[in-house]
């Protein structure tokens, strides 16, 4: 496998990306990394056989406009994506602006033939330890029922090929488990998903079941998916904060935390 790594576009610059690439190369020496960025900032990677440095003199900043990425063809982000377009790599990793990366992907890599809309996917940890793919999590504010069916097929394939799940369970995020729940779009999406022979559709799923681990792929419109993702993130932060405060509230808790 070959991966292109955008080293420059993240909030913290190239330093954490360089360290991550070094650790990844140690664990996965059979994977080739093509790291795009300013050559002088990537010298620590030069001695690693599985890593190739691709010099890129420009950077897509977090403050850049989404459409401004088209003017930065010499940036580390665009150079990494162009390698994917030319089939020189199998995938691209970037810590840069989500909006800029999504737009650049549409401009320079294009969509798979037959796919009407692209989406963003998040892999969620669950109670059971079984990861769940949630999509769309914000690429589109609105979606059609047909697009949700596309997301379901793509998510199912990802779950099979990347997460090695034999027959991934696919569910539709909705306001109730019954097939008649939701607005017109969600009811139509339910019918399309139920009739799709390319996926293992198990029905509607409510937000409270999102992290149960009972479903492998959950599809939703980008607006709802983004809210669901950020609500989950907020709940996780709250839980960690509460646990920390509880642990350090007593001397016994502090001692226990040292050995945890």
Question: Model-found features: residue ranges?
Answer:
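Phosphate/nucleotide-donor binding subsite
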Residues: 48-89
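Glycine-rich phosphate/diphosphate-binding loop of Rossmann-like nucleotide-binding domains
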Residues: 32-34, 40, 141-203, 207, ...
């Amino acid at each position: 496998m070959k991966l292109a790594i955008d080293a420059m576009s993240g909030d913290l610059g190239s330093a954490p990306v360089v360290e991550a690439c070094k650790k990844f190369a140690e664990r996965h020496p059979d994977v080739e990394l093509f790291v795009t960025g300013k050559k002088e900032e990537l010298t620590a990677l030069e001695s690693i056989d599985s890593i190739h440095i691709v010099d890129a003199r420009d950077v897509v900043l977090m403050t850049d406009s989404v459409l401004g990425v088209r003017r930065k063809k010499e940036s580390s982000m665009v150079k990494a994506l162009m390698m994917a377009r030319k089939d020189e790599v199998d995938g691209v990793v970037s810590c840069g602006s989500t909006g800029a990366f999504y737009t650049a992907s549409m401009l320079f890599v294009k969509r798979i033939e037959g796919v009407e809309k692209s989406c963003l996917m998040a892999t969620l940890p669950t109670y059971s330890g079984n990861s769940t793919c949630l999509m769309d999590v914000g690429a589109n504010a609105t979606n059609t029922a047909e697009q949700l069916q596309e997301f379901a097929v793509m998510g199912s394939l990802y779950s099979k090929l990347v997460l090695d799940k034999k027959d991934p369970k696919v569910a539709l995020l909705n306001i109730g488990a019954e097939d008649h729940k939701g607005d017109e779009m969600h009811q139509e999406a339910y019918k399309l998903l139920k009739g799709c022979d390319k996926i293992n559709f198990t029905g509607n799923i409510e937000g409270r079941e999102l992290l149960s681990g009972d479903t492998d792929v959950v599809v939703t419109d980008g607006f709802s998916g983004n809210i669901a993702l950020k609500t989950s993130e907020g709940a996780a932060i709250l839980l960690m904060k509460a646990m920390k405060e509880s642990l350090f509230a007593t001397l016994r808790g502090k001692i226990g935390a040292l050995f945890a």
